[in-house]
């Protein structure tokens, strides 16, 4: 194939030069800076404070429900001991873990002696704590549509009843296997001992990853959840070591509060723990953007309009497919859009009657593409031509039409905007008439109204 000799032909080496890869440590730093920026946008410091208060009110009722469940079935006694040991040794600073677990067990024992009405109140309080956590995670993932109430009730019930049993069984089995392996083998290899010492960290990371997958009302990839889950587990371990060092070297709270020091230390630890969990959730929610190589949501003016046209084209191309339509994940991957961007566009297209969601949670075109104009898309995503200010000032509409249809020419000047000159709309304006007083043959479309 021959090429004309142009300015670019004299430097073939430059054109073929491979793009330099960014060092991995730089990429990791950018990821954490981006996650920190997202954490600031989500106001995680304030959210952690709110969750700390809610946890203090709900942890005793939750623990009472869990302990009553373990007490009702003696076969679960070993599971309970394994769960308590894990909470004390893996999720709390060693300096205060024994005191905190003693207090929590005393409170839970007293609460378990309540009447049926009191027990129902405990269950409701526990569910309120879970609902708060559910709302917080959905806010981090920018979920606008909650699960149906029966589905949420099923998830909450599973978390309250099955969650502690599964966690206790897993921890008991892990500790049992570790003890048996150490008993059968006298000289345990150092690498095996090291692996066993990391089991609590691995279980914590897997637990948080499962939480990030199950709680948000959105499809979360396991690879993203695992990154956030193990990030949370590592941060918790580092915080626990730093917190224990601070309490032993600088016993400020003990000097000031004396025997009462356990309470403020416990509150501070809950707050720091929620910060770690929320930061891990933010990392998991930001992972799709990071994989796309983008470091922010595209908030450029007009970007939703371009995204809406791309979505409509993708849904049009999917007509006739079996199963019908495309899933949100497939659309996001095909169009290189973040789920937040895509969901905002899909919800607006659904309200316009241009797209619809099937029972299989797939998106299809909900209108006749041969007779549907782009007017409602233009009005709702770019410029509402029916707003009163545009009817009162037609020069603005004409100037916008000229800018959209300039096709490489010169944009209108301020004098032309003032009415000294008029431009004829071409290009996109021919598809979507921009004069507010001139609509299609089918009549004007109000914002939010589909022409299907």
Curated annotation (Swiss-Prot):
Matches recorded under InterPro entries: UPF0761_bac (IPR023679), Virul_fac_BrkB (IPR017039)
Topology class, membrane: Multi-pass membrane protein
Protein family according to the UniProt entry: Belongs to the UPF0761 family.
Keyword terms: Cell inner membrane, Cell membrane, Membrane, Transmembrane, Transmembrane helix
Cellular component, GO, one term: plasma membrane
Recorded superkingdom: Bacteria
Protein name stated in the entry: UPF0761 membrane protein Bpet3042
TM region(s), chain numbering: 56-76, 114-134, 153-173, 195-215, 225-245, 259-279
Compartments where located: Cell inner membrane
């Amino acid at each position: 194939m021959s090429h004309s000799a142009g300015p670019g032909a004299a430097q073939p080496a430059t054109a073929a030069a491979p793009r330099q890869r960014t060092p991995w440590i730089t990429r990791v730093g950018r990821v954490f800076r981006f996650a920190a920026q997202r954490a600031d946008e989500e106001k995680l410091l304030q959210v952690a404070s709110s969750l700390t208060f809610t946890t203090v009110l709900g942890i005793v009722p939750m623990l009472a429900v869990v302990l009553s469940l373990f007490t009702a079935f003696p076969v679960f006694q070993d599971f309970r001991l394994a769960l308590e040991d894990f909470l004390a040794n893996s999720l709390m600073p060693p300096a205060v873990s024994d005191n905190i677990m003693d207090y929590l067990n005393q409170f839970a024992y007293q609460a378990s002696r309540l009447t049926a009405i009191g027990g129902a109140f405990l269950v409701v309080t526990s569910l309120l704590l879970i609902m708060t956590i559910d709302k917080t995670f959905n806010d981090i993932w920018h979920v606008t549509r909650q699960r149906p109430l029966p589905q949420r009730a099923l998830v909450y019930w599973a978390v309250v009843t099955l969650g502690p049993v599964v966690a206790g069984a897993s921890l008991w089995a892990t500790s049992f296997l570790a003890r048996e392996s150490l008993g059968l083998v006298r000289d345990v290899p150092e690498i095996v001992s090291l692996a066993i010492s990391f089991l609590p960290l691995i279980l914590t990371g897997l637990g948080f990853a499962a939480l990030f997958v199950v709680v948000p009302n959105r499809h979360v990839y396991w690879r993203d959840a695992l990154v956030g889950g193990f990030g949370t587990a590592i941060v918790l371990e580092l915080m626990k070591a730093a917190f224990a060092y601070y309490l032993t070297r600088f016993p400020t709270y003990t000097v000031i509060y004396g025997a009462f020091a356990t309470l403020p230390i416990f509150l501070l630890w809950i707050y720091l723990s929620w910060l770690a969990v929320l930061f891990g959730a933010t990392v998991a929610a930001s992972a799709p953007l990071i994989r796309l190589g983008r470091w922010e949501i595209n908030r450029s003016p007009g970007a939703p309009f371009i995204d809406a046209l791309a979505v409509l084209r993708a849904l049009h191309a999917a007509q006739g497919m079996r199963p019908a339509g495309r899933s949100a994940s497939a659309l996001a991957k095909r169009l290189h859009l973040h789920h937040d961007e895509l969901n905002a566009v899909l919800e607006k297209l659904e309200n316009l009657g241009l797209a619809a969601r099937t029972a299989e949670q797939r998106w299809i075109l909900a209108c006749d593409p041969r007779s549907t104009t782009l007017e409602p898309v233009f009005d709702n995503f770019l410029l509402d031509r029916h707003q009163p200010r545009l009817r009162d000032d037609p020069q603005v509409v004409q100037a916008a039409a000229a800018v959209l249809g300039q096709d490489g020419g010169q944009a209108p000047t301020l004098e032309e905007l003032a009415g000294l000159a008029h431009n004829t709309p071409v290009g996109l304006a021919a598809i979507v008439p921009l004069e507010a007083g001139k609509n299609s043959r089918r009549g004007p479309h109000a914002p939010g109204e589909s022409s299907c």
